[in-house]
Amino acid sequence: MRLTGSVVISLEVELGWAKHDLNEYDHLSEDRRTETRTLSDLLDWCESAEVPITFDIVGHLLLDACDGNHEGRPGDEWFEADPGTDVESNPLFYAPDMIDAICSSPVPHDVCTHTFSHTPCGEVTSETVDWELQRAQDAHDEFGIPWSRAFVPPRHSSAPVGVLKRNGIDTVRAPEPCRLIQMNTGQRLYHNALSPYQPSDGRVCDGTAVTPSTPYISLGCPNLPMGQLDPHPVFRPIPVSLRKRWHLRRLCRGVDRAIRSDATLHVWSHLWDLSNVHQRDIVEQFIAYVGARQEQGEIDVLTMADFGRAIRQTN
């Protein structure tokens, strides 16, 4: 038995934690003003279209303040970037207002975990992953929201199944196998920006539901400015309007393929990727398209947790 055609949309909300270990912040706006506006717009569009999203949130962002000390995590110096202040002083590292906005929406969005401090799970011990997930779930408790059943590992890393189960996780997002590593720069640019989006079937591994996705952003358009960053120079001679039309068409055709094949299209991005006017234009139209196809009964729009429940029932 297979799922009917479905769409899953996941959005990574990381802000200053995204590249804190690399000391890179130029992709973000000052005091996250643009990211906050983008989230507000996105929630409005989702409400109009009745489209739920899975928000993959770094647990530290649920805090309104801290002293910068997070005892018990194995390893040294990981929290050097933590300002140890509060949301008013350093809104890139604390964002309870954003989580409030998500949870206050009439649309049943899902707040899933992206670890507590954006830790690449494949680069640390299982004990560290365990601490990260425990602390993230504790942050959910402290904020007054349910534990996350779904998990998006930072930077497409993987986590031990036993650690996931111990922390209440039963659904994960994982990239489809891809030949990107074997491609030259030109081939990568083509694959990331122009190749069709193909829906796929999920799977259950050791009791954990896996929703496949691309290894590169798919909701946001990689050949347009991403956040505050310029696109690769090879795309700049192409008119912006043409790039926007092509990406919207690419997304909508992916939905159509999911309908025809009774498979699942999982598109994702970072919040910062979408935080400029060009990206927002595309996403607004795509959300409306998905909502219309859902209203016509042609497709289901699922959160990651919904997807996990559904696929376990079919296996």
Model segments located where?
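An active-site-proximal "capping" alpha-helix that borders the catalytic cofactor pocket
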Residues: 129-140
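The substrate-binding groove and active-site-proximal loops of carbohydrate-active enzymes
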Residues: 23-34, 80-92, 117-127, 147-149, ...
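Short, solvent-exposed turn/loop segments enriched in Gly/Ser/Thr/Pro and often Arg
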Residues: 57-64, 149-157, 302-308
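Hydrophobic faces of well-ordered beta-strands that scaffold small-molecule active sites
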Residues: 7-11, 53-55, 109-114, 149-151, ...
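C-terminal domain-boundary segment and adjacent tail
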Residues: 50, 171-176, 241, 245-315
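Active-site-adjacent pocket scaffolds in enzyme catalytic domains
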Residues: 83-88, 142, 146-261
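Active-site beta->alpha N-cap acidic-glycine motif
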Residues: 2-101, 107, 147, 282, ...
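Short catalytic/ligand-binding loop motif for oxyanion handling, primarily in non-cytosolic enzymes
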Residues: 16-19, 61-66, 119-123, 157-162, ...
